[in-house]
């Protein structure tokens, strides 16, 4: 997907070919630079040596729904299974090993970053991933998830995180409550279950802001900028 902390490392590999889903490429066009700028402001330590990055990562090839490539005799299937962490997430399935790389669609004991997400679609995308019954998943963060029991646990853990966040914010939005009230409601619902998860505190304000927007009918996530970050923090402190 298009997030700067995920795609900007591509230049280090010196790859002659870069493949993206067409939705992800469209998001680089629309908001790639803004994401780079806002992430740099939030996490400067992640951008050490940024001077060596030649610029935004652009694909040489794109596809709409699915694409197959071969690494020697090994088949690798690239698929857009639905909106979740972003509108343009793809997953990679390696059939001969029954392994899937899900990126940030699936996490295990790590918070999901939902600031550019689609809460209402995320569960269906998780169902699509589950239907492959893979033996291992490489998630967005942390160790590989080995065995179908752990894969299932991670998918359901992700579903609980996403649903708990959205349900609490949506109840506040439905009665015309404020972003600060949504923040309080999500904390009450999620802190007892998820407060010890990696990057939970970092993700929470962005997750609440996006859940609150989606619940009020904003389908396309608003672009994050330095100014929007400031406005969000001011609203949450109110």
How would you describe each model-predicted region?
Residues 1-3, 19-23, 81, 100-103, ...:
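Active-site neighborhood of phospho(di)ester-bond hydrolases with catalytic His/Asp-centered motifs
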Residues 75-132:
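Active-site-proximal loop/helix segments of hydrolase catalytic cores
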Residues 121-181, 185:
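Divalent-metal (often Zn2+) His-rich catalytic cores of metallo-beta-lactamase-fold enzymes
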Residues 25-81, 96, 126, 130-133:
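Metallo-beta-lactamase
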Residues 174-238:
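C-terminal regulatory/interaction regions
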Residues 1-15, 88-91:
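Di-metal (Zn2+ and/or Mg2+/Mn2+) metal-binding site signature of metallo-dependent hydrolases
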Residues 68-70, 74-88, 222-238:
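Charge-patterned, long linear interaction tracts outside catalytic cores
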Residues 2-7, 24-27, 69, 86, ...:
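Solvent-exposed loop/turn segments at secondary-structure junctions
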């Amino acid at each position: 997907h298009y997030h700067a902390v995920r795609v900007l490392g591509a230049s280090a590999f010196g790859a002659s070919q870069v493949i993206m889903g067409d939705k992800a490429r469209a998001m680089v066009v629309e908001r790639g630079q803004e994401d780079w700028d806002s992430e740099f402001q939030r996490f400067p330590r992640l951008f050490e040596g940024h001077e060596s990055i030649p610029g935004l990562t652009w694909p040489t090839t794109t596809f709409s729904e699915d694409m197959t490539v071969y690494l020697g005799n090994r088949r690798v299937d690239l698929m857009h299974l639905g909106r979740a962490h972003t509108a343009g997430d793809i997953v990679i399935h390696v059939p001969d090993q029954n392994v899937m790389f899900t990126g940030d669609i699936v996490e295990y004991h790590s918070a999901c970053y939902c600031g550019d997400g689609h809460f209402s679609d995320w569960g269906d995308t998780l169902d699509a991933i589950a239907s492959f019954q893979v033996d291992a998943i490489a998630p967005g963060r942390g160790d590989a998830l080995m065995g179908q029991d752990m894969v299932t646990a991670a998918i359901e853990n992700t579903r609980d995180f996403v649903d708990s966040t959205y349900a609490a914010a949506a109840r506040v939005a439905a009665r015309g409550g404020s972003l600060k009230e949504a923040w309080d409601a999500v904390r009450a619902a999620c802190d007892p279950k998820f407060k010890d998860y990696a990057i939970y505190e970092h993700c929470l304000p962005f997750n609440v802001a996006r859940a609150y927007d989606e619940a009020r009918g904003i389908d396309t996530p608003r672009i994050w900028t330095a100014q929007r970050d400031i406005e969000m923090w001011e609203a949450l402190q109110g």
